[in-house]
Structure formats: C-alpha cells, structure tokens
Amino acid sequence: VKDPRHGGAGESGEQGTAGRQPKPKAKPRVPAVKGLKDDRFAGKTVRPGDTAEVQLKVSETVSHQPGRIPAIVLRGERAGPTVFVMSAVHGDEINGVAIVRHLIAGLSGRLERGTLIAIPVANRFGFDANDRYLPDRRDLNRHFPGDAKGNMALRIADHLFRKVVAISDCGIDLHTAAAGNSNLCHIRGDAGDAAVKGLMRATGVPVLVHSEGPRGSLRRAATEAGIPTILFEAGEAARFHRHAVEIGNHAALQLLSHVGLVGARFQPPAFQTLVRKSEWVRSDHGGILDLRVDPGDLVERKQPIGSIYDPYGRHVDVVHADRSGVVLGIATDPLIHPGMALVHIGQLDKTLQAARDYVASGGDLGYIRWKPPLRREGA
C-alpha cells in the first residue's frame, strides 16, 4: 500500500489499492422524491418526530455474519429536506465519529422539520481494525457511487450511496488527514457548483478550499448526481482533537440551520476566505524534519518554514514556503525521503492581510497545534 504522504494528506492524497482501481458507475440512479419511502429506513419504521438507531447491512464478515454499520435517523414533525452526515469513510479518521456523537446529543432527538441521517462509522471494517482501508486494501473513498456486482469497496459504496446518499438532498462528509499528517479545520467542495458553494459558506468555517474531489470520492459522486455535498477536514488520523470536534459540530449545525432542519439562526462568520490554489511543499532531501509551522499559520513566500537534519545533527537544508497563504496541512512524521509532502499551503492573495487582521483580533482560523517547534541555533 502506498504511503499517503507521497501524494499529500487526507481525502485528496494518492491512496493505495490492490491493483488497478475499477471505474465506478458514472450515473447512479437517484430517486426523484427524496427522504424515507413509506417512513422506513433499512427495514425500520421511523415516523415524523421519531428518532431511531438502525443497523444498516452493507457486507458480510469472514465468519459469514452480517457486516452492519450504525445509522441514526432523526425526523422532524414537519416535512423538509433530507440531509446526510457521513463519518469514518476512512476507518482510522475518527474525529467525525465524535462530531456525530456531539451533534446528535445536542439535537436531543428534535428537528424542526425534515430528516437527518447520520452515519458515524461508514467503513466499519477499517474502523474495527483502526485502518484507513478495507480488508482488501482498497480505499472506500475512491469507489463511489459503487457497483452492486463489483469488488468489496464498490459493493459497500453502492449500499451507502443507494440507501443513504441517493435519498438525501445534500450532505457533509467528515474526514481527517491521513496517518502521518495533520490538517487545518477547513471545508472542501466544488465552489463552481452554486449549491455546493452555498453549503460551504453556510458552515461558517473560516477557510474554504475549492476542489471537485478525487474521482470516486463520496462528495464528488454525490455532487455529480445532483446531491450537493461538502467535506469537513480536520486534524489527524487515530486520535480525537477537541477543537476540531467543536468546530465540526458547529459547522454541521450551521449547515442544518441553513437548510431549515433546525430553528437556530445562521451566524455569518466574521471572516471567511475561499482558497482556489494550493500546493504541497516537498522535500529535496532525505533526513529528519524539524517543522516551524502548524496548520492554520499564515506564511509569506520564501519564508523559512522548517529545516532538515541528518542523523548526526548536521543541517542539510532549509524548507521555504513557495507561496504566501495559510498552512492547510503538515507532515507529522519527521522521517522523510526526497519528494515527500511536507507542508500544504493554500494561496491567499487579496485576503492574506484580512486573515492576518482577523487572527490579530483574536479570530480562529481553525488552528490545530501539532507540537512545539524545536528551535536550533543557526537553522
């Protein structure tokens, strides 16, 4: 399996698969009428005003037991849109699991209208093994909308898409960076789609990143099927970040307010910027990395952002920012090879000074501190 760091971190990185990845279906069937048909979901009746915990079968285990994933369905008394919240499509990305828990607890089983379908653990097999991938080493988030007759990943993706995504009006997919990386709390989506852009802005998250998403990703497949979907990206794999969970929970509530499921008034952010260009700064040398920046830091082009040392402690190279902007993500593993992704910088042109002013006034860009920088003389 390829190390995601070779292609960047999180949803957009190059991910390992077993052999060549089959192409998912291009045009999934999406019902004309959204929501629960006959008030039923996964064989269980969920009437308006009800809340139900459901087990959704998506596969089978090696012991021939049903491979089920948990789902929580909340319904308002009045008719309205259906929204899905999906988490742990990558099994070791668990911040979203906590976000769903806090979201459901905060709603206390009450919606003003419409339906919320929350999937705290989409990749049950990876989650049980604390692994990003499925047992066949495929990345579930490269196989949507799926195929009922395809490989394991395609079949699970097909179940999730047909039973959850296709009956929804919009959705949000919750992710973290891949192992060995940490990401700023930010929203990704296809800002060229007006409905998607509206959802992105509605979350109130300060940093938005324009990206259609990799082919086969949940949000891209859903958006192409006419179901505008965005992605919340924050923190790192296999651990909870309290701050990321708080921001993600608030973002999800803002989205639900925007589409009318909850009565809370939408609170516009004091600052918000849309990043349209971003690149990873990569290493030209192997060695031991000492980074000077964290996700959320603002940097200037040519600014030193880290140093590389050899095992004897000798200085090998200085890493510089290749553009001015905001640090979207960093490598947290200090052991690097040439070409590895070190720092992901989102380019800010007109809004860089506004971002600085916002931070200076006490504003929060979704900052996540990985570790105190190790300062060295002469570095």
Segments and roles (model prediction):
Residues K2-A379:
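Structured catalytic-domain cores with a bias toward divalent-metal coordination
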